[in-house]
């Protein structure tokens, strides 16, 4: 047979067919790869999108962990409330005006604003009112049922509740509208106190309407862990009551601070900044004078004043503020000099009209001349000139070393927020003779009230610097203990014999010196007064009246520090104004804790020593 030759058109057809086949295979391969990518690699993404279109999730807020005092008093809990939301899509159009009018009346909302919200038919969710009480929620529910209004959701919620009101407010702090901690323990332990929210999933259709035959799945919320504090509610009551009276009686302008500590463990048994505020209504200015000042203003000035007043009342002055400790600090200077061997308890000093240091003249309060004195007498008389000499014998290097050893250059480490990162002080390379002189009797340095209290604990407890703390236990939701927190000794600051000598001197101050108003019948008390000048104040007469007392001083257990910032009374002397507050708080505490009245101490005296008269306090010339 003759050979059949392929024509050009036939060969062209075959080439086109092969090209189409290759293209078809490539498309199929691409589709297969894309299908694999969609179904295997990104299946979770599209499943989530589908679930988002088909399900509505409603968060069920978890309760925060509860907070208890050391003696079991409930300080912070949770109360039920209801959050109201609307789905305008689900609301019958003919009911919009009625719904806006009725709900505005029940919830005290703007009717026009509600009408605008309900008229937006594209909206599937809008907030009406956060956390209303049961009465308001029931009223809304009844109104909607009576008028056949759909699209209003009433979700159960939870909010923080402080059953004791303003009690311990500066320590507890408070939470915001989202139940997150804003201040105090609520902020410091926010992660621990915050529980795990639950959720309810409800089926919806393509337009966002809840399906009549829908299903719900639920994950229950888990309450956060709780706290048990070192704060004893009885001692806290003693302190708050005594401070409140002192603030009113002596017209204290810049708030008062009180701290009660266990000198041997660092546990804070009571802490108060007065006036306080109600953490249930933290934005309401509790102090009458501050509130009147704000209300007298208008516009931006009023807004700024309100913010300042709120920030001030929320601030835990005992932890966050720095102050000039004044003559209370002489305990630190004396202890350091004794411990370093710069002086002995038999050393003597002379106090004349004044003392000159590098051309600057210093004098004692009211220009008193104490003459020749022992160390104990210098402490009893709160003699500035003697302590300038003691500081000089100690020297700036040793002074600064002990200042640091007492923890006065660093945060105490207390488990509360907003503690200053450092105090204001002179380092050895910046401290000249004048600075050393003024620092030796408690001026020119600024430390926190808590630092001062912790340092005095070390003076009397055998020389151990203990870390202050306010939380003793972490609790599970059922009340069982998860973790027991133990006292922390930061370091040994003084020899035990130095501490013993200091206790004897502090006892003499209360028996014979400027601390007579801290005497408690039947108990031995040691202490030291202070009347410090506020060097950074525009008011040259501004003073801080303070007193620190320890009882029983022969077996130290409790320390009480009371500071009245800018009192306006017949005197500004700490021995007159603050010492009686310490005595009242400590006497009640000792009786409450069952400490027997082992001695017949002299009755309290109202006599004042010249060293603590209000004329000049701890002021000095030329500085």
Where are the model-predicted features located?
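Periplasmic/cell-envelope proteins involved in peptidoglycan metabolism and beta-lactam response
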Residues: 1-297, 313, 322, 397-407, ...
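Beta-lactam-recognizing serine transpeptidase/beta-lactamase-like catalytic domain environment
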Residues: 76, 205-216, 263-328, 332-564, ...
């Amino acid at each position: 047979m003759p050979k059949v030759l392929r024509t050009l058109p036939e060969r062209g057809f075959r080439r086109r067919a092969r090209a189409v086949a290759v293209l078809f295979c490539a498309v199929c391969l691409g589709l297969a790869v894309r299908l694999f990518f969609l179904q295997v690699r990104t299946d979770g993404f599209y499943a989530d999108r589908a679930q988002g279109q088909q399900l509505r999730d409603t968060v069920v807020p978890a309760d925060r962990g509860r907070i208890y005092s050391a003696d079991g008093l409930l300080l912070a809990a949770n109360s039920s409330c209801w959050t109201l939301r609307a789905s305008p899509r689900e609301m019958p159009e003919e009911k919009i005006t009625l719904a806006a009018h009725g709900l505005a009346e029940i919830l005290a909302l703007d009717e026009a604003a509600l009408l605008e919200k309900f008229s937006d038919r594209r909206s599937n969710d809008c907030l009406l009112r956060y956390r209303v009480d049961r009465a308001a929620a029931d009223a809304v529910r009844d109104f909607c049922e009576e008028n056949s209004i759909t699209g209003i959701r009433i979700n159960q919620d939870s909010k923080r509740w402080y059953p004791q009101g303003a009690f311990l407010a500066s320590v507890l702090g408070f939470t915001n509208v989202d139940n997150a901690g804003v201040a105090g323990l609520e902020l410091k332990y926010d992660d621990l106190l915050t529980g795990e929210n639950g959720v309810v999933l409800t089926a919806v259709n393509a337009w966002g309407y809840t399906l009549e035959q829908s299903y719900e799945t639920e994950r229950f919320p888990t309450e956060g862990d709780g706290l048990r504090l070192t704060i004893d509610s009885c001692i806290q009551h003693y302190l708050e009551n005594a401070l409140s009276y002192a603030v009113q009686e002596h017209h204290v302008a810049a708030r008062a601070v009180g701290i009660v500590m266990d000198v041997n463990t660092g546990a804070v048994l009571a802490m108060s900044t007065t006036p306080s505020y109600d953490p249930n209504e933290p934005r309401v200015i509790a102090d009458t004078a501050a509130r009147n000042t704000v209300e007298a203003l208008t516009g931006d000035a009023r807004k700024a004043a309100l913010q300042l007043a709120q920030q001030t009342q929320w601030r835990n002055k005992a932890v966050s503020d720095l102050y000039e400790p004044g003559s209370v600090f002489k305990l630190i200077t004396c202890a350091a000099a004794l411990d370093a061997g710069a002086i002995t308890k038999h050393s003597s000093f002379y106090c004349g009209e004044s003392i000159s240091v590098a051309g600057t003249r210093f004098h004692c309060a009211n220009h008193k001349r104490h003459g020749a004195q022992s160390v104990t007498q210098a402490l009893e008389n709160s003699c500035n000139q003697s302590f300038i000499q003691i500081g000089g014998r100690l020297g700036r290097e040793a002074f600064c070393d002990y200042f640091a050893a007492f923890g006065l250059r660093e945060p105490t480490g207390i488990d509360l927020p907003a503690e200053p990162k450092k105090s204001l002080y002179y380092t050895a390379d910046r401290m000249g003779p004048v600075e050393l002189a003024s620092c030796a009797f408690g001026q020119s340095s600024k430390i926190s009230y808590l630092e001062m209290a912790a340092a005095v604990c070390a003076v009397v407890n055998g020389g151990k610097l203990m870390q202050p703390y306010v939380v003793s236990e972490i609790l599970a939701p059922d009340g069982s203990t998860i973790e027991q927190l133990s006292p922390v000794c930061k370091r040994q600051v003084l020899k035990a014999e130095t501490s013993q000598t200091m206790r004897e001197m502090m006892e003499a101050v209360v028996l014979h010196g400027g601390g007579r108003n801290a005497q408690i019948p039947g108990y031995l008390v040691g202490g030291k007064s202070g009347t410090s000048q506020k060097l950074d104040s525009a008011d040259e007469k501004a003073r801080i009246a303070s007193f620190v007392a320890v009882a029983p001083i022969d077996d130290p257990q409790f320390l009480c520090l009371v500071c009245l910032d800018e009192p306006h009374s017949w005197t500004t002397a700490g021995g007159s104004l603050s010492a009686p507050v310490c005595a009242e708080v400590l006497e009640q505490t000792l009786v409450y804790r069952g400490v027997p009245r082992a001695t017949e101490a002299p009755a309290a005296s109202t006599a004042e020593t010249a060293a603590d008269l209000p004329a000049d306090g701890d002021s000095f010339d030329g500085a």
